[in-house]
């Protein structure tokens, strides 16, 4: 991996100013004030909203409280998607703060997974990390790690500790110099215009002739509608961590520097905003 810690830090410490408001039909004993929070892009909603939950529960009766869930403009927010991905996919062109509605009843069973504890988040996160390593290294790296290393990865994310996390995670983004990159790039492409949750296929970072594949190469192969023809109008934005990388950027570099802590590149394809 190229030593570019500033990029890694910028990604890790990315924040989204957010205003949480209790749904108007929730029964409260007194008015519920909105709650403001800077959400870490790399984390998960159910991991960083304990204060939000406590804030609104203070004005509610115990019998009116069941599992908390969140929505944005009518769309339930999937807790197992990283926060930055949710924002890029659903709210990237909206004004800040991001306005999220909080619910304590009518859980949308068809749209969301239940999240009864942080153990469920940890299990999901580690499952993604293991899947990513299977793609990158045939699971060699994660299998060679000890249980305490897996725990350190998780605790680094949970406690927002950059160095604690990256001490272990750097091993997951190394590769033999003679290979020029990972075996396959762990990526998922999300679109608001389709019912399909995401696109995920096997894609190598290096072509047969030794040339590095780019973000544009990936999109042209697996999601060609996201790439404007040379003489055509640009209809889509390709977002990773709130930025629009150049299509000429090598995929290997993106995977090393702009992957989320679960080691996947989460790529959002959203309609090009109109002025």
UniProtKB/Swiss-Prot annotation:
Keyword Membrane recorded: yes
Subcellular location: Cytoplasm; Preautophagosomal structure membrane
Any one GO CC term of the record: phagophore assembly site membrane
Name this polypeptide is given: Autophagy protein 5
Species, as recorded: Sus scrofa (Pig)
Maturation and modification: Conjugated to ATG12; which is essential for autophagy, but is not required for association with isolation membrane.
Tagged with keyword Kinase: no
Main function: Involved in autophagic vesicle formation. Conjugation with ATG12, through a ubiquitin-like conjugating system involving ATG7 as an E1-like activating enzyme and ATG10 as an E2-like conjugating enzyme, is essential for its function. The ATG12-ATG5 conjugate acts as an E3-like enzyme which is required for lipidation of ATG8 family proteins and their association to the vesicle membranes. Involved in mitochondrial quality control after oxidative damage, and in subsequent cellular longevity.
PTM annotation (N-acetylmethionine): residues: 1
Bilayer-crossing regions: none
Topological category with respect to the lipid bilayer: Peripheral membrane protein
Covalent cross-link Glycyl lysine isopeptide (Lys-Gly) (interchain with G-Cter in ATG12), where: 130
Subunit structure, interactors included: Forms a conjugate with ATG12. Part of the minor complex composed of 4 sets of ATG12-ATG5 and ATG16L1 (400 kDa); this complex interacts with ATG3 leading to disruption of ATG7 interaction and promotion of ATG8-like proteins lipidation. Forms an 800-kDa complex composed of ATG12-ATG5 and ATG16L2. The ATG12-ATG5 conjugate interacts with RAB33A; this interaction is bridged by ATG16L1 and promotes ATG12-ATG5-ATG16L1 complex recruitment to phagophores. Interacts with TECPR1; the interaction is direct and does not take place when ATG16L1 is associated with the ATG5-ATG12 conjugate.
Keywords (A to Z) from UniProt: Acetylation, Apoptosis, Autophagy, Cytoplasm, Immunity, Isopeptide bond, Membrane, Ubl conjugation
Gene3D superfamilies: 3.10.20.620, Autophagy protein Apg5, helix rich domain, Phosphatidylinositol 3-kinase Catalytic Subunit, Chain A, domain 1
GO biological process terms, semicolon-separated: aggrephagy; apoptotic process; autophagosome assembly; autophagy; cellular response to nitrogen starvation; immune system process; mitophagy; piecemeal microautophagy of the nucleus
Pfam families: ATG5_HBR (PF20637), ATG5_UblA (PF20638), ATG5_UblB (PF04106)
Principal place of residence: cytoplasm
InterPro entries with a match to the protein in the record: Atg5, ATG5_HBR, Atg5_HR, ATG5_UblA, Atg5_UblA_dom_sf, ATG5_UblB
Family the entry assigns: Belongs to the ATG5 family.
């Amino acid at each position: 991996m190229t030593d570019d810690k500033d990029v890694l830090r910028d990604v890790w410490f990315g924040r989204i100013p957010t205003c949480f408001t209790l749904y108007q039909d929730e029964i409260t004993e007194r008015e519920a004030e909105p709650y403001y929070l800077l959400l870490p892009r790399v984390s998960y909603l159910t991991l960083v909203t304990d204060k939000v939950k406590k804030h609104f529960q203070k004005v509610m009766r115990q019998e009116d409280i069941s599992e908390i869930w969140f929505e944005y403009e009518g769309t339930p927010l999937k807790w197992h998607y990283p926060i930055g991905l949710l924002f890029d996919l659903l709210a990237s062109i909206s004004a800040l703060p991001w306005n999220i509605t909080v619910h304590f009843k009518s859980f949308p069973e068809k749209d969301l997974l239940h999240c009864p504890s942080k153990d469920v988040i940890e299990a999901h996160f580690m499952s993604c990390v293991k899947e990513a390593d299977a793609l990158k290294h045939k699971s060699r790296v994660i299998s060679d790690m000890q249980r305490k290393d897996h725990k350190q990865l998780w605790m680094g994310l949970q406690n927002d500790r950059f160095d604690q996390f990256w001490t272990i995670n750097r091993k997951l983004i190394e590769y033999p110099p003679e290979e020029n990159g990972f075996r396959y790039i762990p990526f998922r492409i999300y679109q608001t215009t389709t019912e399909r949750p995401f696109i995920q296929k096997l894609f190598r970072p290096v072509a047969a002739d030794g040339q590095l594949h780019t973000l544009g190469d990936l999109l042209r192969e697996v999601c060609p509608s996201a790439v404007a023809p040379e003489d055509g109008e640009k209809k889509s934005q390709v977002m990773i961590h709130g930025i629009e990388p150049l299509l000429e950027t090598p995929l290997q570099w993106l995977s090393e520097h702009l992957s989320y802590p679960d080691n996947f590149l989460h790529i959002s394809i959203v309609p090009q905003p109109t002025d």
